[in-house]
Regions:
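Beta1/beta-strand and adjacent pyrophosphate-binding region of the FAD-binding site
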Residues: 1-9
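Active-site substrate-recognition segment that forms the wall
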Residues: 11-18, 22, 45, 80-84, ...
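Glycine-rich FAD pyrophosphate-binding loop
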Residues: 20-40
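Dinucleotide-binding Rossmann-like beta1-alpha1 core, especially the glycine-rich loop
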Residues: 44-126, 130
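Short beta-strand to alpha-helix junction loop
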Residues: 54, 58-64, 94-100, 141-157, ...
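Helical element adjacent to the flavin cofactor pocket in flavoenzyme catalytic cores
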Residues: 140-178, 190, 194, 198
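C-terminal catalytic lobe of FAD-dependent flavoproteins
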Residues: 287-356
Length: 356
C-alpha cells in the first residue's frame, strides 16, 4: 500500500514511522523545512495524569499508552540517543494560591471518581529527597509515572531515521488541496492508496472549527540549578511549567494563551515567566536566556483530537498542547483503523466519517 502524508510535524513523522514499519510505502510532504513547525516549539512534558486537571480520561489513556508502550519502542529504533526520562513530575504552588492548589487536586480526583492512585502529596522532607534544591516549598504533588522528552532532538532523529529507510521527504512544498487518494501541490498531482492529512493549522478546510492556541517558551541555561523533574507552578491565571534538559538547560513556558498569534514573545510573558522561575529557585538569577520561541498549536472546539476518515483519506488534527503526549498512541490507533477497515478501534470516540 502507498501512503502520502501531508504535514511533517510530530504526528506526520510518527505516522510515517508506523506505516513504514507495517510495510507501507510512504511519502512525506511539508510546507516548510523540517525545523519550522509547532512540534519544534514544544517543551516535551508528558503528563497524562496532571493534565486531568483540564483534560479528560481518554487523553490520559492515550498518554499512558504513549509513555509505556510507544516512546521506548520508537526511541529504540532511532539512529541516535534521545533524552527520555520517566522520573515523574511535581506540581507546586505559591503560598498565596492555596485555593488553586486545592481546586487542582479536586478536579483530578473528580475525574478518577475519588480513586487516587496517580499522585502523592509530599511532605517537605520527601520533597527535598526528590529535589534537594526546592527547599522553600513545604509540600508538593508528585506524579511518579509522568515523563519528559527532548522533542527537538527527537524530531531531528526521526527525520534521520525516515531518510535512512528511504522515505521521500518533499519539503518546502505547500499542499494546495487533498482528496481521497490524492495530494495536490503547485507543481504536481500525487496519487496514493491512502492520503493522511497531518497539516495542523493548514487543514482548516477539513476541520472548520480549527484554531491556533499560542504557546510561548523560553530556553534557559542555569549552571547554578540542579532540578531533575518537570515542575508545574500553579497560578490562577496561567500554568507555568519548567522542563529540565541535559547540560543544565531548562525550558519554561505557559501552557496556553487564547490567541492565534505567531509574533515574538511579549514583554509581559517574559516578565511573568522569569519572575516565576526565579521564585521557584533563586539560582535562576544568573541563568542565561538562550532563546525564546513562539508557535500556535492546532486546537478544535472541544480541545480534543479528531480523526476523520473516508475511503482513501484519513485526517487527524486538534492535538492541542498534547502533541508529544498522545501522537504515538494516535499513530498506533490510526494504523489499527486503516488496517482493520475501522473495525478494531481502541478510541472510537475520536473517529468520525468524512464527507467532502
Amino acid at each position: 500500500m502507498r501512503a502520502g502524508i501531508a504535514g511533517a510535524g510530530i504526528m506526520g513523522r510518527l505516522l510515517a514511522f508506523a506505516l513504514h514499519n507495517a510495510g507501507w510505502q510512504v511519502s512525506l510532504f511539508d510546507h516548510s523545512n523540517e525545523n519550522m513547525n509547532c512540534s519544534t516549539a514544544a517543551a516535551g512534558l508528558l503528563s497524562p495524569f496532571s493534565e486531568l486537571d483540564k483534560s479528560i480520561l481518554l487523553i490520559s489513556s492515550l498518554g499512558q499508552e504513549s509513555i509505556t508502550n510507544c516512546w521506548p519502542r520508537i526511541i529504540g529504533h532511532l539512529p541516535e540517543s534521545v533524552y527520555f526520562q520517566q522520573s515523574g513530575s511535581l506540581v507546586l504552588c505559591h503560598p498565596g494560591d492555596q485555593a488553586e492548589w486545592i481546586h487542582f487536586s479536586r478536579r483530578i480526583l473528580n475525574q478518577l471518581n475519588q480513586n487516587n492512585c496517580v499522585f502523592q502529596k509530599l511532605s517537605h522532607e520527601n520533597l527535598i529527597t526528590l529535589e534537594p534544591e526546592l527547599t522553600k516549598f513545604e509540600t508538593a504533588y508528585y506524579f511518579p509515572n509522568e515523563a519528559h522528552i527532548d522533542c527537538q532532538t527527537l524530531m531531528v532523529s526521526l527525520k534521520k531515521y525516515l531518510d535512512s529507510i528511504g522515505i521521500p521527504y518533499i519539503a518546502n512544498t505547500p499542499v494546495l488541496s487533498i482528496k481521497p487518494g490524492e495530494i495536490n501541490t503547485k507543481e504536481q498531482r500525487y496519487h496514493f492508496d491512502v492520503v493522511f492529512d497531518c497539516r495542523g493549522l493548514g487543514a482548516q478546510t477539513i476541520f472548520p472549527d480549527l484554531r491556533g492556541i499560542r504557546g510561548e517558551l523560553i530556553w534557559l541555561h542555569a549552571p547554578g540549578v540542579q532540578l531533575h523533574r518537570p515542575i508545574r507552578l500553579l497560578h490562577p491565571r496561567y500554568s507555568l511549567y519548567l522542563v529540565p534538559r541535559p547540560g543544565n538547560l531548562y525550558l519554561i513556558g505557559a501552557s496556553e494563551i487564547e490567541a492565534e498569534d505567531f509574533s515574538p514573545v511579549s514583554v509581559r510573558t517574559t516578565l511573568e515567566l522569569l519572575t516565576a522561575v526565579y521564585y521557584l529557585h533563586a539560582g535562576f538569577d544568573e541563568a542565561r536566556i538562550i532563546k525564546m520561541v513562539t508557535h500556535c498549536r492546532p486546537t478544535l472546539a472541544n480541545h480534543l483530537p479528531r480523526i476523520k476518515f473516508a475511503d482513501g483519506l484519513i485526517a487527524v488534527n486538534g492535538l492541542y498542547r498534547h502533541g508529544y503526549l498522545i501522537a504515538p498512541a494516535l499513530a498506533a490507533e490510526i494504523l489499527r483503523g486503516v488496517t482493520s477497515n475501522y473495525q478494531h478501534l481502541n478510541y472510537p470516540e475520536f473517529w468520525e466519517s468524512y464527507c467532502d
